[in-house]
Regions:
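A short, basic N-terminal segment
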Residues: 1-91, 219, 225
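AAA+/P-loop NTPase substrate/partner-engagement loops
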Residues: 121-155
Length: 363
């Protein structure tokens, strides 16, 4: 008996079925959350000298120079030592300079590359440096509790927070309190976002307590603006148009370690899995194949999809899809609302992953 199914005139589909994200319900213990607070695989090997500043954007070279000096100033017994204070003294005349740096810029200008390079360049053992997204940091607090998180991170020289965008007043108060405690313990901070610290949460919440927390949070950082075009698409061909359901299905069966799900079912499954587990959801995947991609129906669903897109991008997992193109995932209302920066980042990252997946389809 044949071990494959064939369509006349086309190559056979292997009998072994692809994986399914919808069949996965990962459990992530707290110790894994702590152990994984390192730069993701995409940024394992990045360094300051592998960042290529755009000569038309002097802010990019300035950011490399400033961050290199910041990393050098974190040597010594602890991040609260005099070396760090001297570094900030050279940069600002204020008597109480901020104890962190904040990389603000558009999509794809290399902020995460620079943040990971800072982590790698800081002269401390990996166990004394932490790197994670804002979502991962709040998940860590949820898993360990506030006091234990302070205790776990207070001995670190550096905490790097990627994608620092505050969408919830409760998270704002939580993280502001956490960072204030860590600063008191001498932990240096570095963060990236598409929004300056003083503007975090703008247009989303107007409560006085929320605004007060934002102002207190911004005082911990020295902003560094990084200008430039999205490097993920710089000089590259356009992302491929969506494929057919049949092409995506065949590619999933032909690619070892690929998953295959229809998009509506995946969105429903994401609602049942905590975002802290989305990274584990993609463990050992070589490609994600999606059929029936369509515009997301509501903001809660869209925000969950953003987190999944970030985890796939971090892990360099190609995404092959049929249906609507990724730049049509979010409505005009979403792209003009308070979460628009998240949505544009997701479009940029998914487009890059779609380009990576093009070779999975037989020509």
């Amino acid at each position: 008996m044949s071990s494959s199914t064939a369509v006349p005139g086309q190559s056979p589909i292997a009998e072994t079925a692809p994986l399914s994200l919808c069949a996965r319900e990962p459990h992530v213990p707290a110790d894994r959350l702590v152990a994984e607070m390192v730069p993701p695989p995409r940024f394992d090997t990045v360094r300051f000298d592998t960042y290529v500043p755009d000569p038309k954007q002097p802010s990019q070279r300035e950011a490399v120079d400033v961050l290199s000096g910041f990393a050098a100033g974190l040597g010594g017994a602890h991040a609260s030592g005099s070396a760090r204070r001297r570094w900030f003294a050279r940069k600002a005349a204020a008597p109480a300079a901020p104890l962190g740096v904040y990389l603000d810029g558009g999509y794809g200008v290399g902020k995460t590359h620079l943040l990971a390079s800072l982590w790698h360049a800081t002269p401390a053992a990996p166990a004394l440096k932490a790197f994670g997204t804002f979502v991962e940091l709040t998940n860590l607090v949820g898993a360990l509790g506030f006091q234990q998180t302070v205790k776990t991170l207070s001995g670190h020289r550096l905490l790097c927070i990627d994608e620092f965008e505050l969408d919830d007043p409760g998270d704002t108060v939580l993280v502001s309190s956490l960072l204030s405690r860590l600063v008191e313990e001498g932990v240096a901070l570095a963060a990236t976002s598409n929004t300056l610290p003083g503007k975090l949460g703008e247009g989303r919440f107007a409560a006085a307590d929320f605004l007060r927390e934002i102002q207190g949070l911004s005082a911990h950082f020295r902003p560094l603006r990084i200008d430039g075009e999205d490097y993920r698409h710089r000089g590259l061909p356009e992302a491929p148009a969506p494929f057919t359901d049949e092409q995506v299905t065949r590619a999933a069966y032909a690619t070892e370690g690929a998953s295959l799900d229809d998009f509506p079912s995946l969105l429903a499954h994401l609602a049942r899995v905590h975002p802290s587990r989305y990274g584990a959801l993609t463990d050992d995947l070589r490609a994600v194949c999606l059929t029936e991609v369509r515009a997301v129906p509501d903001q809660a669903t869209a925000l969950r999809l953003v987190v999944l897109a970030d985890r796939l991008y971090d892990r360099e997992v190609p995404v092959l899809a049929s249906g609507v193109p990724f730049d049509k995932l979010f409505s005009d209302e979403m792209l003009n609302g308070g979460y628009r920066k998240k949505y544009f980042r997701a479009i940029s990252r998914l487009t890059a992953l779609a380009r990576d997946a093009k070779g999975l389809v037989a020509q």
